[in-house]
Design a protein with these regions (language model features):
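Anionic-ligand binding patches
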Residues: 2-15, 22-202
């Protein structure tokens, strides 16, 4: 397969399939120092997540961004998986309820009386070439235990998942901890060597 490249100025351009600049900066930092011009996706690009797995959803987003920009594109999809709920909410984490408070309250209600609190955040990250074809994928998992009440107000599932190694909730992890312990950080670090090889980065 022919390898295509997209250049912005003198640097290869990589599109992160999100419109959130904070997430773009977060993923760029997680990938480590790379000679890339990292950009977010076009503002008017809106991809419906119709996949049946995290990977399928990530591929939909990365492929659409790659085809629109003509550049390599990276996307991720993630969710909270609760053992006592047979992996729910999983793929439907973002749509589990309207708003963070409602999501937290629904999870806590469904776990009433259950002694089993183990859960994890799972993320899958994919890389698509400019033709929209998926060329690499990686997964990251952060295990923890769900608290009986959120650690702080206004947070979502991340305010409930206690990460024992960090001695705080997922939502309280700092940037370095997110890269080392977080599910997205683990996926990004696992994908980085493949990205370097595919894009011929030194």
């Amino acid at each position: 397969m022919e390898t295509l490249f997209c250049r912005s100025s003198l640097a290869l351009q990589l599109t992160i399939a999100t419109g959130n600049p904070i997430k773009v900066a977060e993923i760029e930092a997680m990938l480590g120092p790379l000679p890339l011009d990292v950009q977010r996706q076009p503002a008017d690009l809106d991809v419906e997540e119709t996949g049946s797995t995290y990977r399928e959803n990530a591929e939909l987003k990365a492929s659409a961004a790659a085809l629109r920009t003509g550049c390599w594109a990276l996307a991720d999809d993630s969710g909270l998986e609760v053992d006592a709920l047979q992996g729910a909410p999983g793929l439907y984490s973002a749509r589990y309820a309207e708003g963070n408070d409602a999501k937290v309250q629904r999870i806590l209600k469904e776990l009433v009386g259950s002694p089993y609190r183990s859960a994890c955040f799972r993320s899958t990250m994919v890389l698509c070439d400019p033709s929209g074809s998926c060329r690499a994928a990686a997964e990251g998992i952060c295990w923890g235990e769900l608290l009986s009440a959120p650690a702080y107000a206004g947070g979502g599932f991340e305010s409930l998942l206690w990460v024992r190694e960090a001695r705080c909730t997922y939502g309280e992890l700092n940037a370095a901890q997110l890269s080392r312990l977080g599910s997205r950080g683990k996926a990004a670090r696992a994908l980085a060597p493949q990205l370097r090889e595919l894009l011929h980065l030194s």
